[in-house]
Amino acid sequence: MITEGAVTSADGTRIGYRRLGSGPALVFVHGSVSTHTDWMRVAKLLAPRYTCYAMDRRGRARSGNGRSPYLLEREYEDVAAVMAEAGPVAALIGHSYGAICALGAALRHPVPRLVVYEPPLPTGGPIAGEFLDPYRRAISEGDLDLALEIGLSRFTRLPAEAILAIRVSKAWPRLRTLAASWIRELEAMDTLDPSVDRYAALDCPVLMLVGSRSPEHPLRDASRALAAVLPGARVETIEGQGHMATRNAPEQVARLIESFLNT
């Protein structure tokens, strides 16, 4: 059974989540232009053995947007609030921008175990860079299809055939509704310190997931840089997959997560 719940973050913002399963707690944090649904296929596979909390980050679904200006620090606080609800032994699991949020939260509020799937840290240069202005312009002009094509091709570096497949899928209307929220997250990523040395302070077992077909920048290069400062981290490749294995290969992702949790 899936139930809905919510917590109040440090700044008073309501953060919603879906809860399912029973057993040790897991908290899932989704990436940009997405919601808790990105993790639900994985969560349903793990629910027979774990209590899964799939949160909605601020500004989408049942979570509030918070006050301006937007700060990544508020995202860390949101994650910490859900972790507090899940309990002190909850493992934290983040994908993409959600992995950046999970890393930041874990630095400030220690967690027993951490899983990160391709955090787009700017180790090899800006994530959006010169393409952020065209993206903003497309959003301001209401051309959400163009904005998403810019974002998927220039920010996540997806090949044309992958973008076409997404555009004709049921996911495209949902991406359109979230396209504007990507701006503030891209701005936040491009202002991050490109050095990942700060993450060496993490004092917990870490699993890093990397898609074998993911682009070099900003995903594989950032994962390599992060692994270099976390020599004890376990790095697992999701064979035959890129950045969206949570949806496209949930069985592989769930299996790798559970293997890590059981060691």
Walk through the language-model features, giving the residues of each:
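Conserved HGGG/HGGXW glycine-rich cap/lid loop of the alpha/beta-hydrolase fold
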Residues: 6-68
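Glycine-rich His-Gly loop
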Residues: 28-31, 96, 211
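Active-site loop/oxyanion-hole signature of alpha/beta-hydrolase fold enzymes
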Residues: 41-44, 53-93, 97, 252-255
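Conserved hydrolase catalytic core segment
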Residues: 88-125
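Helix-rich cap/lid subdomain of alpha/beta-hydrolase
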Residues: 123-172, 179, 183-188
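Conserved serine/cysteine hydrolase catalytic core
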Residues: 174-228, 237
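Catalytic histidine-centered segment of alpha/beta-hydrolase-like enzymes
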Residues: 238-250
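Post-His helix in hydrolase/transferase enzymes
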Residues: 247-259
